[in-house]
Amino acid sequence: MQAIQMTIPNFRLSKIEDYLYTLDEMKLVNQIGNAYSLAGDNEKAADIFYRLLQYMRCHLQEMVTSNRMLPLVLYNFARSLDLLERYEESARVARNGKEACIKYGHYQVLHSCLEIEAECDFFLGKKEESAERYREAFYICKVMRYEDDLQIIRNEAQKYLDIIF
């Protein structure tokens, strides 16, 4: 909070939409949401990511800077909703994140959006869709050499669907 208050002295999380942000300030707001999530307050994190998405949709519809941030914020929002066991919402947001990655050509969180969508689909009883999303996430991680994430996907796919990669 102190970092963003250096450039926006009256910044309040409850009023995210009341300010104009630089790309770096949007990254700070995103990191504040991540800090709440890591501390276990996923409800607060989800609210921060939701407000940041609303801000981005209102102020930065087609700007290049928002296009880089959009997939990341959608992923973080989906992750928070997943941790809150709000699977339908989380799957929808993760799909939006996947589409944003593809639309804007920013693939850093594509595999993560697919993994969240796969997990949510599993908990929603959509096992075939879940298996397909895990496969997609697995092969993206394999191609990109994301070894840590590859192992997470292997473990989840085996645990939930008895799929061995």
What would you call each of these model-derived segments?
Residues D24, Q31, M69, N76, ...:
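"A position-specific structural signal for the A-helix of alpha-solenoid helical repeats
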Residues S37, M56-Y104:
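Alpha-helical adaptor scaffolds
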Residues Q2-I16, Y50-Q61, R95-H106, E136-Y146:
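Amphipathic alpha-helical segments of tetratricopeptide repeats
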Residues L20, K27, T65-R68, L72, ...:
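Residue register of alpha-helical TPR repeats
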